[in-house]
C-alpha cells in the first residue's frame, strides 16, 4: 500500500497542498513550525479519522475555514483506491472510499495501515498499559477479521456490567452479562496472545540489529491471573467490583511487558535505546502485517535524527527501507537524512510557512 497522490486543504497551517509521493522514501524538510509535521498528521488523519497530536480534532481545521478536506489515491495489489475525508468544525465527518460513503472509521484503518514514529512515541513505554493495548490491538485488528467485532462486543458488555455495578445490582443480574463477557473476552485474549507470539518472532531479529548487547524479553499479560479461570474470577471479585463501581480484571487490563533482566525496559535503557526499541516494535508490526496479509504499512517518521547518533540513524533508516514500505520522513535539514541513506530519497518536499514544494 502506498499513496501516489495526496491533497490537503485547510489543515493546520496548510491552506492547500498537492503532493505526488514516491513509493519509497519521501523526505519532507523545513524549519520548525513550517508545516512538515502537519503533512504526516494529515496522512494519519486520513487513515484514522483523528490526529496523533490532539484528541480535539477541531483544532486541526484552519481558523478561517469551516472544514478540512483530505484526499489520496492509494495504490495496492488489488488496484487503486480513492480515499476522501471532510471534517466539519461541528465535528461531523464525511468519508468516502471509491465514491462509497464509509460508516465506520475502522474501514479507513483497514484501507490505510499506518505506523507512526515521533518523539512522542515514548508514550508506548511510559503512559501505562492503555498505549500498549492499542499497539497490540492495531496488529490484532489487521491480523484477524474476528477481532474488531469481538473487542467491540467486549467493550459494550463491560460498559453494561460497570453500570450495573454502579447501580448496586445483585450478582444474579450481572451473571447474565458475565456469560457473554467471558465468551468475547476469551476470543479477544486468544487473538491478542497469538498476535504477540507472532510479533515476538519478527521482533527478535530487529532488536538484535538495533541493540545486540541487550537481552529484551517481551510478554503478553491478559488482564487477569493466568492460573485463574475468568468465570470464577468474575464471581469471586464481585464484591470488590461492586465496592469500587467497575470491573477490576479482564481484557481491558491487558498489557505488553518489556523487560531487561528484572527491570522494566524503561528503567533499564537510555533514552536513545528506548527510541530504538519503540522503532523496532513499529518496524516489526509492519513486517508482520506484510507476512500475514501481504499488505505494506505506511510509515510516518517525524524528527528521526532526535537522540540518535549517525550510526544508529543509518541503521534505523536501513531497517525502514528494507521493509519495502512507503516512508514519509521529516527533518529540519535534508542532509541529516540524505547523508545516512544508501541511495537518494524517491521524493523530496520543502515546506515553508505551510507551502509545499517538490524539490526532487
Swiss-Prot record:
Its biological purpose is as follows: The RecF protein is involved in DNA metabolism; it is required for DNA replication and normal SOS inducibility. RecF binds preferentially to single-stranded, linear DNA. It also seems to bind ATP.
Instruction: Supply the gene name.
Output: recF
PANTHER family per the record? DNA REPLICATION AND REPAIR PROTEIN RECF
Superkingdom of origin: Bacteria
Organism, by scientific name, is Shewanella amazonensis (strain ATCC BAA-1098 / SB2B)
**By what name is this protein known?**
DNA replication and repair protein RecF
Q: Which Gene3D superfamilies match?
A: P-loop containing nucleotide triphosphate hydrolases, RecF/RecN/SMC, N-terminal domain
Family listed? Belongs to the RecF family.
Q: Which GO terms describe its cellular component?
A: cytoplasm
Main site of residence? cytoplasm
Binding positions (ATP):
30-37
Q: Which UniProt keywords apply?
A: ATP-binding, Cytoplasm, DNA damage, DNA repair, DNA replication, DNA-binding, Nucleotide-binding, SOS response
* Short name of one Pfam family: SMC_N
GO MF annotations for this entry? ATP binding; single-stranded DNA binding
Q: Name one GO biological process term.
A: double-strand break repair
Q: Where in the cell is it found?
A: Cytoplasm
Amino acid at each position: 500500500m502506498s499513496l501516489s497522490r495526496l491533497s490537503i486543504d485547510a489543515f493546520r497551517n496548510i491552506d492547500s497542498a498537492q503532493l505526488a509521493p514516491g513509493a519509497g522514501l519521501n523526505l519532507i524538510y523545513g524549519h520548525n513550525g513550517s508545516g512538515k509535521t502537519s503533512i504526516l498528521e494529515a496522512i494519519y488523519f486520513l487513515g484514522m479519522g483523528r490526529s496523533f497530536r490532539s484528541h480535539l480534532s477541531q483544532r486541526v481545521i484552519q481558523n478561517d475555514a469551516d472544514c478540512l478536506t483530505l484526499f489520496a489515491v492509494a495504490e495496492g495489489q488489488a488496484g487503486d483506491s480513492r480515499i476522501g475525508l471532510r471534517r466539519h468544525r461541528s465535528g461531523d465527518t464525511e468519508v468516502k472510499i471509491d465514491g462509497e460513503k464509509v460508516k465506520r472509521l475502522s474501514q479507513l484503518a483497514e484501507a490505510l495501515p499506518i505506523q507512526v514514529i515521533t518523539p512522542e512515541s515514548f508514550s508506548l513505554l511510559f503512559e501505562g498499559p492503555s498505549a500498549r493495548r492499542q499497539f497490540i490491538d492495531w496488529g490484532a485488528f489487521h491480523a484477524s477479521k474476528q477481532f474488531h467485532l469481538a473487542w467491540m462486543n467486549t467493550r459494550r458488555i463491560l460498559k453494561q456490567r460497570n453500570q450495573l455495578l454502579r447501580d448496586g445490582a445483585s450478582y444474579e443480574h450481572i451473571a447474565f452479562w458475565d456469560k457473554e463477557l467471558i465468551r468475547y473476552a476469551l476470543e479477544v485474549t486468544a487473538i491478542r496472545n497469538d498476535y504477540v507470539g507472532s510479533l515476538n518472532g519478527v521482533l527478535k531479529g530487529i532488536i538484535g540489529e538495533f541493540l545486540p548487547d541487550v537481552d529484551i524479553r517481551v510478554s503478553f499479560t491478559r488482564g487477569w491471573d493466568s492460573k485463574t479461570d475468568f468465570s470464577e474470577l468474575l464471581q469471586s471479585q464481585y464484591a470488590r467490583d461492586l465496592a469500587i463501581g467497575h470491573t477490576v480484571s479482564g481484557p481491558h487490563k491487558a498489557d505488553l511487558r518489556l523487560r531487561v533482566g528484572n527491570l522494566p525496559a524503561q528503567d533499564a535503557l537510555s533514552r536513545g535505546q528506548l527510541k530504538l526499541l519503540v522503532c523496532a516494535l513499529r518496524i516489526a508490526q509492519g513486517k508482520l502485517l506484510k507476512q500475514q496479509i501481504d499488505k505494506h504499512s505506511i510509515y510516518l517518521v517525524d524528527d528521526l535524527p532526535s537522540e540518535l547518533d549517525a550510526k544508529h540513524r543509518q541503521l534505523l533508516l536501513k531497517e525502514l527501507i528494507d521493509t519495502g514500505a512507503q516512508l514519509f520522513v521529516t527533518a529540519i535539514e535534508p542532509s541529516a537524512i540524505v547523508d545516512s541513506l544508501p541511495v537518494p530519497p524517491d521524493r523530496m518536499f520543502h515546506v515553508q510557512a505551510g507551502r509545499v514544494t517538490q524539490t526532487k
